[in-house]
A protein has these predicted regions:
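Small cysteine-rich, disulfide-bonded extracellular modules of the LU/uPAR three-finger superfamily
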Residues: 1-144, 150-192
Length: 192
């Protein structure tokens, strides 16, 4: 009896372990704006995904990581006018932002003061305003966007150039016309 058996077996296995787990923190912010007329009816709503300026990032890092006591001045929120508009840039500062002007006293639309931000506790990598900030228009015009200023010298006075510009941005849906007595209800969420 001649029996032959040829047994063949092939088996493969591989294990790949990803050792370069990287988390990247980038500063982002989003303004949500609702415009209401004098009777409280919604006229329009839009969002702004903003530019966090280089100086704003630097102040945030110095504040977060300095290891000493620090009391924040501000932040205060203001509005960007369509007057003399060209662009928002990461290199903008409160003293030098040639691509845009602040709405308020000199440039339409007009309102009385920048608004003071009050925050909820941070959660899931984000920090949001605890309530919408309300801007009541005292004169008609076209609003382009919003900005945040804080740090040493920052104040609620419209057109003041002190403090550090943290962020600025324009509406995703284009310019927005507002009338005298309209209100802009603005929320903001910052995330890393």
């Amino acid at each position: 009896m001649n029996e032959k058996a040829n047994a063949k077996c092939a088996c493969g296995c591989s294990l790949v372990k990803h050792t370069d787990l990287i988390k990247k923190a980038e500063a982002h912010g989003r303004f949500n704006v609702v415009c209401k007329d004098k009777d409280g009816k919604i006229k329009w709503q839009d969002t702004i995904d903003n530019v966090v300026t280089t100086l704003g990032k630097n102040l945030a890092l110095d504040t977060f990581l300095a290891g000493s006591g620090y009391t924040v001045t501000g932040p205060y929120m203001g509005l960007i006018s369509s007057v003399s508009w060209s662009a928002v840039a990461a290199a903008d500062t409160m003293g030098s932002h040639a691509g845009w002007t602040e709405a308020g006293i000199t440039n339409a639309p007009t309102y009385t003061t920048r608004k003071t931000c009050a925050w909820d506790a941070a959660a899931t990598g984000a920090k949001a305003l605890s309530a919408a900030l309300v801007f009541t228009m005292t004169g008609a015009g076209t609003v382009k966007g919003c900005f945040l200023v804080y740090g040493t010298g920052a104040v609620t006075t419209v057109d003041n150039t002190d403090g550090t510009l943290y962020s600025a941005g324009v509406f995703t849906g284009g310019d927005k016309v507002v009338a005298d007595t309209d209100t802009l209800n603005v929320t903001y969420t910052a995330s890393l």
